[in-house]
């Protein structure tokens, strides 16, 4: 291994290398060795606490790794940026995220605090609870960290009486929080007292920690990026969901300097390392270093997220449940500018509380966060809000809808009601609500994944549940795909009703017409919708016997064309005129004049014959169906006797028609796939 944090030369004899924070492991290009390790539970542990309370020393005492990697950190003896270490205890692999304690570096602390499973709240025995202890602990509560413990460090520096006093202060400090009743351990990183007990306690807590979803859409918030000459760009972060494999095509979202939602920059995962070991696959809950192929370092920065290409979308607005800390210096007025920390990103935003003009300290409400630059978020993601100036932590919350529309003032009550439903929804109900929100456009599986982050398996189960409950309709016949829209039943039925009413009005105005053109209905009602939805609505109405589909025509099942004896005779006369003409068609105007009825009715009869297929339009000509069918049979016999090839001259000789009719007929036959043109020759396909 070679230390890259100090910029040492990489030997040219190396064939290739995979990089992890601070190190390089050499191996052959194109080969990603699988490290055979037993299945372990993966837990991310974050430190929290005031500056100089011994967080980094504690991590080193546990793991043997000095998480301070910067020269300035070592010179000044304080942590400035996040650091990492790992430890295996039994069947649990711990990844430690060591965060800075100084108030100036809280934004760095926030970049590392996302995705932790357990928090180790560090309190120095010689100082007890201090300002950054409080702010870090507020952040952990706002991020909804569920479990952890308290470590009283520097226990060797004070007497028993003071230790007991600090323990009492700590107990009072965490009362009513997730750390109430949690283990409180005395540790000396210098002497090693309490370190073994700390490892055992972490193992017990890990056993109760919730497993992450390895099948959800993968997301890796980038907290560090760097490059190695001759090798490329490397990013690191905690994989908070899903899995990433060597060779995967990934997308970095949002793109650098993006002013609005836009596709990300794509790259391929050339190599992976998890906790210092080369691997083919990284799973949720692991610290990962990824060498990216096809992207420059200038296109990567802290705060972006790595995800599977094309699966997720960034947004400039987030709907959320926002809570203001009771310790916030003042209320948060509508459109206040704040610093939003989500994942590893810091984004400036305006807060718009829904249904109120101000959020008071200690209160919560639904709010829309309008971002000045886009970010990637999903429902369930927790965030921190810090005041724009002075920069202090004032609150936080959870994302409910990551791709909302902009809410106007008059829509606030409706938006809040919608968010209340989403907030309480389980995975099935969320799919149902998202599809309901999509209205008549519906929502396909990929769109649902982009709005929820759920795995395809979860979405498929949820979609089956809502269709079985008749809350939605799958807008496609089998086989269904990820792009098959799911339409809420009320919206689907509304479209079906519009088809029925459109046909009813058509039949009222044109009682002698057999039906309305399928394409005309599509353009009138479905032009702005995916084609699958049009096909599904029509198929559903036909299945319910409410409409009849006859070739390219649609009609209500109840519609019948009733002609008088005189009208039927005129219609039959028109058909007979074209049948007698064969492949030497008479002009339509001449046939109408000979029909025996007025021009308007004769034109309707001709259109009825065309709609029913008895007459066939070929360019500007009209032929009887029997003539076209006879032509097909003539071509079939010609092919059997003379082979499949014929030119225009042979076609004219075969049919007895002039070039005036031969060319349109041949072009029609090409469209019907009866013939296929190749230069001046046709091939008979029958």
Model-derived segments and spans:
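Short hydrophobic alpha-helical segments enriched in small aliphatic residues
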Residues: 4, 10, 18, 25-28
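Conserved catalytic-core segments of large NTP-driven translation/proteostasis enzymes
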Residues: 155, 161, 172-328
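Conserved nucleotide-binding/hydrolysis micro-motifs of P-loop NTPases
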Residues: 102-103, 126-130, 154-159, 189-193, ...
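Conserved G1/Walker A P-loop phosphate-binding module
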Residues: 39-78, 83-96
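Residue-level signature of catalytic and energy-coupling elements of molecular machines
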Residues: 52, 58, 77, 98, ...
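C-terminal effector modules of nucleic-acid-centric enzymes and ribosome-associated factors
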Residues: 158-162, 172, 275, 295-617, ...
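Conserved Switch II/interswitch segment of TRAFAC-class P-loop GTPases
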Residues: 103-104, 114-135, 145-164
């Amino acid at each position: 291994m070679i230390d890259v944090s100090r910029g040492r030369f990489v030997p040219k004899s190396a064939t290739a290398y995979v990089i992890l924070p601070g190190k390089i492991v050499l191996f052959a290009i194109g080969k990603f060795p699988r490290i055979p390790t037993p299945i372990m539970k993966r837990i991310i542990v974050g430190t929290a606490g005031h500056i100089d309370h011994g967080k980094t020393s504690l991590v080193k005492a546990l793991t043997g790794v000095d998480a301070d990697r910067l020269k300035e950190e070592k010179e000044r003896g304080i942590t400035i940026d996040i650091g990492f270490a790992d430890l295996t205890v039994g069947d649990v692999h711990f990844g430690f995220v060591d965060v800075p304690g100084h108030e100036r570096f809280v934004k760095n602390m926030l970049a590392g605090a996302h995705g932790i499973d357990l928090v180790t709240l560090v309190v120095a025995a010689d100082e007890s609870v201090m300002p950054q202890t409080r702010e870090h602990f507020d952040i952990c509560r706002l991020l909804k960290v569920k479990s952890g413990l308290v470590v009283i460090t520097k226990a060797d520096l004070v007497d028993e009486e003071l230790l007991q006093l600090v323990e009492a202060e700590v107990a009072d400090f965490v009362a009513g929080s997730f750390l109430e009743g949690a283990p409180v351990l005395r540790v000396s990183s210098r002497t090693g007292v309490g370190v073994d007990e700390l490892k055992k306690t972490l193992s017990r807590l890990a056993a109760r920690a919730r497993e992450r979803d390895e099948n959800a859409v993968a997301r890796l918030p980038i907290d560090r990026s760097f490059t190695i000459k001759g090798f490329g760009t490397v990013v690191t972060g905690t994989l908070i969901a899903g899995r990433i494999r060597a060779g995967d095509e990934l997308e970095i979202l949002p793109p650098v300097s993006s002013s609005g939602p836009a596709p990300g920059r794509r790259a391929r995962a050339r190599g992976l390392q998890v906790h210092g070991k080369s691997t083919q696959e990284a799973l949720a809950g692991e610290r990962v270093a990824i060498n990216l192929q096809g992207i420059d370092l200038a296109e990567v920065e802290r705060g972006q997220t790595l995800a599977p290409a094309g699966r997720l979308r960034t947004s400039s607005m987030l709907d959320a449940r926002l809570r203001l800390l009771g310790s916030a210096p003042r209320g948060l007025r509508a459109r206040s500018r704040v610093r939003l920390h989500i994942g590893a990103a810091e984004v400036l935003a305006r807060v718009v509380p829904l249904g109120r003009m101000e959020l008071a300290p200690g209160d919560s409400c639904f709010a829309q966060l309008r971002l000045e630059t886009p970010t990637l978020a999903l429902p369930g993601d927790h965030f921190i809000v810090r005041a724009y100036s002075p920069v202090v932590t004032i609150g936080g919350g959870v994302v409910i809808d990551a791709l909302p529309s902009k809410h106007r003032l008059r829509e606030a009550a409706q938006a809040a009601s919608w968010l209340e439903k989403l907030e309480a929804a389980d995975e099935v109900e969320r799919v149902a609500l998202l599809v309901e929100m999509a209205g008549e456009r519906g929502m396909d599986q990929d769109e649902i994944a982009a709005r929820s982050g759920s795995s395809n398996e979860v979405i498929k189960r949820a979609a089956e549940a809502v269709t079985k409950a008749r809350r939605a309709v799958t807008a496609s016949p089998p086989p269904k795909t990820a792009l098959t829209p799911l339409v809420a039943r009320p919206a689907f039925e509304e479209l079906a009703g519009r088809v029925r009413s459109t046909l009813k009005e058509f039949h009222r105005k044109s009682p002698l017409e057999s039906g309305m053109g399928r394409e005309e209905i599509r353009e009138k009602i479905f032009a702005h919708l995916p084609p699958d939805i049009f096909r599904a609505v029509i198929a559903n109405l036909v299945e319910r016997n409410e409409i009849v589909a006859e070739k390219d025509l649609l009609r209500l099942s109840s519609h019948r064309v009733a002609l008088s004896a005189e009208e039927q005779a005129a219609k039959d006369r028109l058909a007979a005129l074209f049948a007698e003409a064969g492949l030497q068609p008479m002009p339509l105007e001449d046939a109408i004049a000979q029909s025996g009825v007025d021009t308007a009715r004769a034109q309707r009869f001709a259109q009825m014959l065309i709609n029913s297929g008895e007459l066939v339009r070929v360019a500007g000509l009209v032929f009887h169906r029997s003539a076209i069918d006879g032509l097909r049979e003539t071509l079939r016999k010609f092919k059997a006797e003379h082979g499949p090839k014929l030119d225009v001259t042979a076609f004219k000789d075969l049919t007895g028609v002039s070039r005036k009719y031969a060319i349109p007929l041949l072009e029609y036959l090409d469209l019907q796939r009866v013939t296929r043109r190749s230069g001046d020759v046709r091939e008979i396909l029958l």
